[in-house]
């Protein structure tokens, strides 16, 4: 499935239902306000390295995990 301008799809991000107009994992990371190099990502249970996020297409009902490092102790 290819997204068209203005089209939104239903996905799950970090266990919560969400909608996005992002066509790729990299676009979703940016849309959610994360710094590209500061997070780890998984799509449907599979790790997705930073270098391939821009070519990793999203589809309805995809399950995405985005993990950002935390500071503190």
Which role fits each region the language model picked out?
Residues 1-72:
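Ubiquitin-like/PB1-type beta-grasp interaction modules and other compact soluble beta-rich domains
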